[in-house]
Amino acid sequence: MNHSKRTNLPGILLLYTLAFSPNNAWGQYDRLWIPDTLSGTTFNLSIRDSSAQLRPGNLTKTAGVNGKFWGPTLILNKGDMVYMNVYNYLPDTTTLHWHGMHLPAIMDGGPHQPIPPGTLWQPYWKVTNNAATYWYHPHLHMMTVQQMTEGIGGFIIVRDSQEASLALPRTYGVDDIPLALTSRSYDASNAFAVYNNVNISQYGDYMLTNGTPNAQVSLPKQYVRLRILNAEIERGYNLGFSDNRTFYIIANDGGLLNSPVAVTRVKLMVGERIEILVNLGGDAVGSSLDLKAYNSGQPYGFPGGEPITSGLNGSLLNNIDFSVLHINIVATTSNPVTTMPATLANNTYWTAGDATVSRTVHVTGGGTDSAFSFDYTPFSMGTINKTVNLNTIEKWTIVNNNVFGHTFHIHDVQFMQFEHRI
């Protein structure tokens, strides 16, 4: 079997010093930047240092994929073989992890697949995932926080025949909008403040949506689809609209739900994705509303719910409600989606009774090198902590014994959460 390849790159020095064009006007709002798309079966991705005008004054040092912050949205089709050419022009080693994708471990892009400076990594795999919103991001051990803070990452949208058969909004950038939610803090020179001490929070003081501060977008007077990703280091979001309108969850990390779920609030934790439909058909052209984080008054342990604004675990966004996107209503498109399907998919879910193996995993304090560990065991790159047999169904009980809330994600596979107790 041919494995992913790494080759040295020719000596090229490129310095990007570009203003982040959507944010050059410092009014109340700035136009939401929507990433370009790449489609096909071969994708060329270059990771470089750059700089962007995120605040008045000095440029902020950033890093991005094929640009100055974040990266292009990759459009993949279920059943295709896809080939990635990942060029690392950074001065540091990095990785690129395909978050949520089912693929061979050697193609995963986790800490065990480093890409040294000046080299090319060429993973490939057959797309077997259902249509959904996924993403890619760096995952180098002890460098993930810094490289994600600088802006490396991007969306992946998988399409399939089931999703294509439904009358859903899918005109990218018009009625189908990707939203990466992050926050950042800055020092006096406008550099990103990155805290490498794992026992200090990574909560940012200022909201960035797709890298845009004070983001606003124009959306048509019809059903609109928002693909929302929590791309934070730590913060959670309790999302809803400023008029408390009902919206509908149609998909999550694993793909389409069986039917839309009506809500007025939804919590989104780090790395998690949802797709929602919101009906703007009854809104007047020229009116506006906000997608907001209703993060005030959250229970103890909610990431970003701490009632402190500075110091350890402090942030100006902690324990308050704030806008993540200002929405202006414009005229309908020429072919609007005006109704919502009652049925989306026919998923069959396992139950706890289907499991033949049960495990209990405790989330515990990690000591000086990490705020978290599993079962009091420090992480080791050379250690296999759990061995799972292929084609078995397991029930895992995750018990968080830590004082902080934390998300849980397994590379390569999806899992069904059937109970959650606090």
Give the role of each language-model region.
Residues 26-277, 297-299, 309-367:
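Histidine-centered copper-binding motifs that mark active-site loops
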Residues 131-135, 283-290:
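Short glycine/proline/serine/threonine-rich loop/turn segments at secondary-structure transition edges
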Residues 359-417:
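C-terminal substrate/ligand-recognition segments
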Residues 1-28:
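Bacterial Sec-dependent N-terminal signal peptides
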Residues 270-274, 283, 296, 391-394, ...:
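Long, structured stretches of catalytic cores involved in phosphate-ester chemistry, encompassing
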Residues 243-255, 401-422:
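Active/binding-pocket-proximal capping segment
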Residues 272, 277, 285-287, 400:
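Ordered core of a single globular domain
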Residues 288-305:
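Sequence/structural signature of beta-propeller domains
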